[in-house]
Regions:
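TPR-repeat structural position
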Residues: 186, 231, 411-414
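Long, intrinsically disordered, low-complexity segments
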Residues: 26, 113-116, 188-190, 257-314, ...
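Flexible, polar/acidic helix-loop-strand segments at domain edges
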Residues: 90-93, 98, 321-394, 541
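An aromatic- and glycine-enriched ligand-binding surface/loop that stacks and positions planar moieties
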Residues: 27-90, 194-197, 211-356, 474-495
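Bacterial N-terminal signal peptides that target proteins for export
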Residues: 2-13
Length: 542
């Protein structure tokens, strides 16, 4: 794709149109003023409006723009131990058979990343031609640099070291790119994010909703520092966000992920979706259970459900509140907000059930459904809702700050716990008991479990976490389970169920024991890229 993209660099009008065609209202104004055939490098970069139009085009095609809801990003939760997405392409991932010729997942992420990087490089090479206020120009340059750095963060997370392209290339240059090291990629991205943060505003008016904030640049930098295990740097970065005093922990939880919560001050980075125009096609359709008129494409594993603590703060294995005949009673309220629980959740006046005929198939893959993004009483177009897509929340900042402090061997005090993890789990709608544990080993496990339940199905957070913690292979190498189907598994024949142990009587879903290789923690470099450029090397085990 790098060669395909950079082959176009000599056609200036085509490059400009890449930034224009995805727009709506602004596009008509421009075309009324100037025919497409007249677009040229000299005529386009002449006004502030041109710069803003080009910047909007970068946003729209990026991983935080209108492409953010593409399936291959939403389904990457199924590259973790949290969920099962019953789709043929995702099945390849989940069964351990993803190959370099895949285009939906491995190919799409790579292509979108480098398309955005190319647009940013072209933008930065030309924006100085525009006469506009110096502070405003610095701000739009900062936004463009953020979008490029964000793509490099994503590419580094999915593929490891990748070609590091910082300028518009000639065709010959594009055909000879080699993979930079992971450190080179992450160092460049962090440097760009530092520069961007200096010129980005801490807040924006409602009219600029969806544009990048200072905290977003710092939060992605923090993610990179956690990835690189630069704990001291991460502590400083996350503290800088906290000290901005611009974001809060919303007292609500479920509403944050619905259209009514899209202005929450907890949200640091999101994609602005507009129903019927740039609508979200997934939340009210793909996640909506079939019993309520949706597809229910993705199902949570019992392994995730079991991670939600009891209201007394203890796990189900040790809490006196746990009753195996009523397994969903007295649990962390985030369980009820996140997952449709079979024969328990009531939604739109109807109890959630998964027919046995649907278990293990596209409908009801595990017997559990994802409730987090589905709006009760939704009456709009299911395939084009106005639900924004959240990428980063302030809760991530606080939990990451605590983790970085822990791993940097800094003092763990009750005050620190209260400022971070207890603030997250203490929101009014959740109100879980405070964490008081200061033993470093025990607290590490508490933080990791807290991240798992707080951010369940939130884009790539779980995948990012198990990768950087070095446990991806271990947590994936197991038999996964769905809902409990019987108390008498020995005589149950409708579906394959576990006969003994912790998950006795539960549906046996995907068995990944012995089917994985450690190299599969990374996606394969797309085969088409290697065919175009023989200097690109493939990731291990593909």
């Amino acid at each position: 794709m790098i060669m395909k993209i950079f082959n176009r660099i000599r056609i200036v009008s085509a490059c400009i149109l890449i930034s224009i065609v995805s727009l709506s209202g602004c596009q008509k104004d421009l075309l009324d003023q100037q025919p497409l055939t007249d677009l040229s490098e000299g005529s386009f970069w002449s006004s502030e409006g041109d710069a803003m139009l080009a910047l909007t085009g970068i946003y729209n095609g990026s991983s935080v723009g209108n492409n953010a809801y593409n399936n291959e990003l939403l389904i990457l939760a199924s590259m973790t131990d949290d969920s099962d997405y019953k789709n043929s392409k995702v099945g390849l991932i989940y069964s351990g058979y993803l190959v370099s010729s895949d285009t939906q997942v491995a190919g799409s992420i790579w292509q979108r990343g480098y398309r955005t990087i190319f647009k940013v490089n072209y933008f930065l090479a030309n924006v100085d031609k525009v006469k506009m206020d110096a502070a405003k120009k610095a701000e739009v340059i900062a936004e463009a640099k953020f979008l490029r750095a964000y793509e490099y963060w994503a590419l580094a997370m999915y593929y490891g070291g990748v070609p590091l392209v910082k300028k518009v290339l000639t065709v010959d240059e594009s055909n000879s790119q080699v993979r930079a090291t992971l450190a080179e990629v992450t160092d460049f991205a962090k440097t760009e994010l530092v520069a961007a943060a200096k010129d980005l505003p801490a807040t924006r008016p409602d009219s600029q909703k969806g544009r990048i904030l200072k905290a977003a640049a710092l939060a992605v930098k923090g993610r990179l520092e956690l990835m690189d295990k630069k704990w001291a740097d991460a502590v400083k970065t996350y503290k800088e966000i906290i000290d901005l005093n611009t974001h809060i922990i919303d007292p609500r939880y479920k509403a944050i992920f619905e259209e009514k919560g899209e202005s929450s001050k907890e949200i640091i980075l999101s994609t602005n979706c507009i129903a019927g125009l740039y609508g979200n096609p997934q939340n009210q359709l793909g996640y909506h259970p079939d019993v309520y008129g949706g597809y229910q494409e993705d199902g949570a594993f019992e392994e995730l459900v079991s991670c939600y603590l009891m209201k007394d703060g203890l796990p189900i294995e040790t809490s006196p509140l746990y009753d195996k005949s009523k397994p969903f009673e007295n649990r962390d309220p985030r369980l009820y907000a996140t997952i449709f629980l079979p024969n328990y959740t009531v939604f739109n006046g109807v109890k959630f059930t998964t027919a046995n005929s649907g278990i293990g198939k596209l409908v009801g893959a595990t017997g559990y459904g994802w409730k987090k993004y589905v709006t009760e009483g939704f009456a709009g177009a299911q395939g084009s809702s106005g639900d924004d897509i959240i990428h980063i929340r302030y809760a991530e900042v606080l939990l990451s700050y605590l983790e970085a402090k822990l791993e940097n061997n800094e003092a763990i005090t009750q005050a620190l716990l209260d400022e971070t993890i207890n603030k997250v789990r203490g929101r009014a709608e959740v109100a879980m008991l405070n964490v008081t544990e200061t033993d470093r080993t025990k607290l590490r496990e508490i933080i990791r479990n807290e991240r798992r339940v707080e951010f369940a199905l939130e884009r790539v957070i779980r995948y990012m976490d198990i990768r950087r913690w070095g446990i991806w292979f271990d947590v994936m190498e197991q038999q996964f389970h769905g809902m409990k189907l019987t108390d008498d598994p020995a005589n149950y024949t409708a579906s394959k169920v576990e006969l003994t142990g912790k998950y006795k009587g539960h549906l046996m879903t995907i068995n990944k024991k012995g089917s994985h290789k450690r190299g599969w923690a990374l996606l394969p470099v797309p085969l088409t890229e290697i065919q175009l450029n023989s200097k690109l090397t493939q990731n291990p085990d593909y």
